[in-house]
């Protein structure tokens, strides 16, 4: 019995423990599980409702999308029709524009082609004419006839005389021209009492003073300041050169600084001119003027044909002594050269002031001719002139310019025929080559 009671008590204890410690958690767990199940069921119901709503919304969206798509398609069709119409209109306008532009281009090309053909035809005509002229003047008699015809035309100009100035005075203004004339007259009176040696010394003294004035710009400017009282200028001049030059040179220079000059450089030009006149007077007394003039003109042509030599003689970087040495070396290699020509050319090279050497040499030759009251005419011909033609050229030009004329002839076969005459700055071009060139230049563009 006790065993049964003990087992009963044990069972009761177990039941108590289970009830006390096991049942409450189980109940709580079951309640939680029930809550979870209920929540899941509620969620499932909500999801089902949402699914139904989503399905309904999807169906509505699909229907709306279909309707919108149909609307977009219709609008696209309308836009396509409108764009097609616009493109057709624009294409028509563009086609018309291209057509008009094409017509203009065709007209422009036609005009250009016509102009080009005319130009080519003109050039070909000139070329053919040139060939005919060349063939015609290949006969010396026909070439001489072109000179005679030009002289006939030139002869008609003879009554209209032109005044030709001294070569040096051509670039001076009126005051300097008067001063130069007075200085030349002073020299002419002084030269009568001087022998050739004194004239040569005078030329050398004047060149040295011209070089001094060329270096001393301020002194030159002071000596040419316009003022009524020339005494201060004379005193300055005497302090500078007294005892260094001879009395004839000092007399010339005193007269020079008393004159009124338009520009400072004109004083140097005038002194250089008188120094040349002194040497030319020596040549005239010795009967060497013709030879001197010929050699000076020949040397100017050499410089014109040899630009390199002209540049070397006018190179201011090289001292004057070096350039004069080069000049003398060239003249010595040429054979016998008139000593006065050597002296004149040496002075010219020493006193170059920005002028090309070939122009300075030509001016020197013109000064030599002008001293005899003659005018220099540079005549260019395709061939040598006969004596009768040369005489006629001299006579016609003498009547035109009212002075005796010295003709310096140059031959250039490229001129074909006729003559080109240059007197100072005036050029009379009656060559066949220039007429052909003028004809070609007048062709339409």
From Swiss-Prot:
Chain residue ranges for the region called ATP synthase subunit b: 1-168
Protein's cellular compartments: Cell membrane
Give the CDD domains listed for this entry.
Answer: ATP-synt_Fo_b (cd06503)
Its Gene Ontology cellular component terms are:
plasma membrane; proton-transporting ATP synthase complex
Cited Pfam families: ATP-synt_B, OSCP
Q: How does it sit in the membrane?
A: Single-pass membrane protein
From the record, what ranges are coiled-coil?
none
Alphabetical UniProt keywords: ATP synthesis, Cell membrane, CF(0), Hydrogen ion transport, Ion transport, Membrane, Multifunctional enzyme, Transmembrane, Transmembrane helix, Transport
Report the GO molecular function annotations: proton-transporting ATP synthase activity, rotational mechanism
- Membrane spanning stretches: 4-23
Region annotated ATP synthase subunit delta, chain positions:
169-445
- Top-rank taxon of the source lineage equals Bacteria
The protein's job, in short, is: F(1)F(0) ATP synthase produces ATP from ADP in the presence of a proton or sodium gradient. F-type ATPases consist of two structural domains, F(1) containing the extramembraneous catalytic core and F(0) containing the membrane proton channel, linked together by a central stalk and a peripheral stalk. During catalysis, ATP synthesis in the catalytic domain of F(1) is coupled via a rotary mechanism of the central stalk subunits to proton translocation.
Entry's family note:
In the N-terminal section; belongs to the ATPase B chain family. In the C-terminal section; belongs to the ATPase delta chain family.
- Subunit text: F-type ATPases have 2 components, F(1) - the catalytic core - and F(0) - the membrane proton channel. F(1) has five subunits: alpha(3), beta(3), gamma(1), delta(1), epsilon(1). F(0) has three main subunits: a(1), b(2) and c(10-14). The alpha and beta chains form an alternating ring which encloses part of the gamma chain. F(1) is attached to F(0) by a central stalk formed by the gamma and epsilon chains, while a peripheral stalk is formed by the delta and b chains.
From the Swiss-Prot or TrEMBL record, give the protein name.
ATP synthase subunit b-delta
């Amino acid at each position: 019995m006790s065993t049964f009671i003990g087992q009963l008590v044990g069972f009761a204890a177990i039941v108590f423990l289970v009830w006390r410690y096991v049942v409450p958690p189980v109940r709580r767990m079951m309640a939680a599980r029930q809550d979870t199940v209920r929540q899941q069921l509620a969620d499932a119901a909500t999801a089902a409702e949402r699914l139904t709503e989503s399905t309904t919304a999807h169906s509505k969206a699909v229907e709306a999308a279909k309707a919108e798509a149909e609307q977009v398609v219709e609008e696209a069709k309308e836009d396509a029709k409108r764009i097609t119409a616009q493109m057709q209109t624009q294409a028509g306008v563009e086609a018309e524009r291209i057509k008009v532009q094409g017509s203009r281009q065709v007209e422009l090309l036609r005009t250009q082609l016509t102009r080009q053909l005319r130009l080519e035809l003109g050039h070909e005509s000139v070329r053919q004419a040139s060939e005919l002229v060349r063939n015609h003047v290949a006969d010396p008699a026909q070439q001489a006839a072109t000179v005679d015809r030009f002289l006939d035309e030139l002869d008609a100009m003879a009554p209209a005389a032109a005044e030709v100035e001294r070569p040096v005075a051509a670039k001076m203004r009126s005051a300097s021209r008067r001063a130069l004339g007075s200085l030349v007259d002073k020299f002419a009176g002084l030269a009568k009492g001087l022998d050739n040696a004194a004239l040569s010394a005078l030329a050398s003294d004047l060149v040295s003073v011209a070089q001094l004035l060329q270096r001393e710009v301020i002194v030159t400017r002071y000596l040419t300041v316009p003022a009524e009282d020339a005494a201060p200028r004379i005193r300055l001049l005497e302090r500078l050169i007294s005892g260094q030059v001879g009395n004839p040179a000092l007399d010339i220079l005193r007269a020079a600084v008393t004159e009124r000059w338009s520009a400072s450089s004109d004083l140097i030009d005038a002194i250089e001119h008188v120094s040349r006149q002194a040497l030319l007077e020596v040549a005239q007394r010795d009967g060497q003027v013709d030879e001197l003039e010929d050699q000076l003109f020949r040397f100017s042509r050499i410089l014109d044909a040899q630009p390199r030599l002209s540049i070397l003689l006018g190179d201011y970087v090289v001292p004057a002594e070096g350039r004069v040495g080069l000049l003398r070396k060239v003249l010595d290699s040429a054979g016998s050269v008139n000593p006065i020509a050597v002296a004149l050319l040496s002075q010219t090279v020493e006193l170059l002031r920005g002028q090309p050497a070939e122009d300075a040499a030509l001016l020197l030759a013109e000064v030599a001719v002008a001293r005899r009251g003659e005018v220099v005419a540079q005549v260019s011909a395709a061939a040598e002139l006969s004596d009768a033609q040369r005489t006629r050229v001299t006579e016609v030009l003498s009547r035109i310019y009212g002075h005796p004329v010295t003709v310096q002839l140059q031959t250039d076969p490229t001129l074909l025929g006729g003559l080109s005459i240059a007197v100072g700055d005036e050029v009379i071009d009656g060559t066949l080559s220039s007429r052909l060139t003028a004809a070609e230049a007048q062709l339409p563009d």
